[in-house]
């Protein structure tokens, strides 16, 4: 692999024409094994280029990350050269990042066009896709087999199966087990979860592609009320403060029958220290009724170069290295992160290491985007208003119908004459 990585770096350096050893800093989140994987790659990159890469560790919460990024970029901070960015941030931060279109012209056709499009703003490629994301339903196949249950296809089936297995396992001395864990803290992750409940129930996607505010409807309200009914019955009350890692912690210790989470949790769940190693599988998220289409929120992480960086050439070389086929292959095998390069879904090594991954391709290809493209720079506010309304509902502060009605008023005011 070292030879392949070296080739990727050499190609990137040739394109950028960097002639001196640079010191660059990359901001990246601490979810799962991301930081450990990056540190290994930095060693190889430094060896091949002579550059020095420092890691600026960010919290796993994308909401906290975005807030810090905005502060740095608004101040014209040159300390951070490369930013790991969420798929939804491109429209909001585009003006702060370098256009990578020319630098990536030799490889851009290898990526999924829809993912490249998500990072293109006004014709400028503001970030290179590092890995894509779409959540799925993790389930304990051993427990479903034990009780003769099928993988649930609807949310109602999920609740019933989760409750039955949870209760029977508790009777059999598994006192700490819960039926279903997910992410219900008041942050961007709750927007993702709630969008899935609503969209899969025919309730729209908060703000439609044409800019119409659609969230205040009966199907959306019913979806939220259904989720509210899980709290304290099949989901622990503490789920209201769970983000991805808290949900994974409960799941990986063997204390949940089902979990909604992103692909990164797959390899960790099969780690040597996992209580559920070899005992689980994944399936598409449930729907409201048979015949409805599963709705996984489109996620993914990208790499952007700051326009305030004093080492843009070296920063671009690092971005091309970290998004290369060889690195994405390693990330898929080691971290179970979904590649953004089309050809890797036919790679036999990836299929052998992560048998689920080829089957995940249609999940993310049909994934539902959050309304960041249509709401543009106002998306962060749209999302925070939405997740607040959802969290209030789940917490018992007002009904879903009441909270969505108030949300519609707030979003209409926020939109003004246009998004």
Predicted feature locations:
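Short, solvent-exposed loop/beta-turn-alpha elements that line the ligand-binding surface or hinge
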Residues: 101-113, 179-188, 201-222, 271-275, ...
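Glycine-centered hinge/linker elements that transmit conformational signals in sensory
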Residues: 162, 209-240, 285
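Hinge/lid segment of periplasmic solute-binding proteins
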Residues: 86-135, 175-176, 190-193, 200, ...
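Short, polar/charged alpha-helical segment
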Residues: 32-53, 386, 404
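Short, well-ordered beta-strand elements
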Residues: 22-32, 51-57, 81-82, 126, ...
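Extracytoplasmic "Venus flytrap"/periplasmic binding protein-like
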Residues: 25, 44-114, 118-120, 142-153, ...
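Long, aromatic- and glycine/proline-rich binding clefts that accommodate carbohydrate-like moieties
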Residues: 114, 118-119, 283-285, 333-385, ...
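Extracytoplasmic/periplasmic solute-binding protein
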Residues: 126-130, 135, 159-212, 256
């Amino acid at each position: 692999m070292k030879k392949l990585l070296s080739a990727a770096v050499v190609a990137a350096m040739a394109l950028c024409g960097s002639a001196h050893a640079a010191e660059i800093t990359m901001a990246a989140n601490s979810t799962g094994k991301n930081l450990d994987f990056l540190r290994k790659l930095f060693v190889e990159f430094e060896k091949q280029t002579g550059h020095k890469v420092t890691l600026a560790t960010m919290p796993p919460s994308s909401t906290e990350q975005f807030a810090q990024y905005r502060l740095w970029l608004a101040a014209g901070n040159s300390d951070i050269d490369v930013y790991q960015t969420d798929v939804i941030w491109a429209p909001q931060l585009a003006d702060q990042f370098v256009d990578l279109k020319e630098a990536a012209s030799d490889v851009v056709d290898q990526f999924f066009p829809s993912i490249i499009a998500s990072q293109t703003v006004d014709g400028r490629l503001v970030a290179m896709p590092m890995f894509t994301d779409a959540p799925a339903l993790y389930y304990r196949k051993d427990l479903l087999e034990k009780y003769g249950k099928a993988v649930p296809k609807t949310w109602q089936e999920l609740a019933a199966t989760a409750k039955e297995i949870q209760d029977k396992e508790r009777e059999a001395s598994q006192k700490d087990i819960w039926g279903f864990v997910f992410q219900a803290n008041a942050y961007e992750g709750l927007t993702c979860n709630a969008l899935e409940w609503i969209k899969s129930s025919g309730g729209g996607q908060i703000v439609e592609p044409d800019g119409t505010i659609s969230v205040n409807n009966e199907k959306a309200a019913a979806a939220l009320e259904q989720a509210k009914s899980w709290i304290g019955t099949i989901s622990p009350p503490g789920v209201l403060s769970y983000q991805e890692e808290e949900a994974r912690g409960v799941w990986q210790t063997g204390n949940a029958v089902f979990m909604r989470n992103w692909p990164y949790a797959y390899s960790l769940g099969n780690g040597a220290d996992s209580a559920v190693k070899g005992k689980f599988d994944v399936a598409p998220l449930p729907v409201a009724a048979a015949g409805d289409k599963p709705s996984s929120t489109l996620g993914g992480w990208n790499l952007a170069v700051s326009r305030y960086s004093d080492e843009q050439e070296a920063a671009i070389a690092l971005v091309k290295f970290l998004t290369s086929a060889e690195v994405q292959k390693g990330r898929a095998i080691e971290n179970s992160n979904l590649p953004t390069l089309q050809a890797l879904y036919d790679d036999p090594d990836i299929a052998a290491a992560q048998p689920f991954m080829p089957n995940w391709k249609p999940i993310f290809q049909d994934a539902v985007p959050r309304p960041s493209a249509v709401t543009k720079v106002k998306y962060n506010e749209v999302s925070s208003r939405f997740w607040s309304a959802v969290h209030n509902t789940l917490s018992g502060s007002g009904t879903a119908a009441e909270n969505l009605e108030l949300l519609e008023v707030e979003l209409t005011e926020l939109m003004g004459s246009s998004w």
